[in-house]
A protein has these predicted regions:
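A short local loop/turn or secondary-structure capping micro-motif enriched for an aromatic residue
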Residues: 60-65
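General secondary-structure edge motif
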Residues: 1-3, 59
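Core segments of cupin and vicinal oxygen chelate
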Residues: 2, 10-53
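Vicinal oxygen chelate
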Residues: 4-13, 41-46, 66-82
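Generic preference for hydrophobic
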Residues: 55-57
Length: 82
């Protein structure tokens, strides 16, 4: 089955600060920065070679764990196109 990488989605306590760090450390470009309907800040970044990295915060009233099976900080998911 053919597939290609689409994006990575990270969850952060401070999506803006995290995105700024990636800009400084790895020359990412911030494509958009908005608050979604669910109340979470969503920052879309692009690497110098075109990979997309999305960074978002907790949704309204969402309880975030450190690394459990529920919603948690860090890697939320990575997306593949099939």
């Amino acid at each position: 089955m053919a597939y290609e990488f689409d994006h990575v989605h990270l969850k952060s306590v401070d999506p803006g600060a995290s995105a700024d760090w990636y800009v400084r450390a790895f020359n990412f470009k911030i494509i958009s920065d908005s608050v979604r309907l669910w109340g979470d800040r969503f920052v879309r970044c692009e690497t110098p070679d075109g990979a997309i990295v999305n960074i978002s915060g907790a949704r309204t009233d969402e309880m975030m764990g450190d690394a459990d099976a529920g919603a948690h900080w860090g890697l939320e998911h990575f997306g593949l196109k099939v």
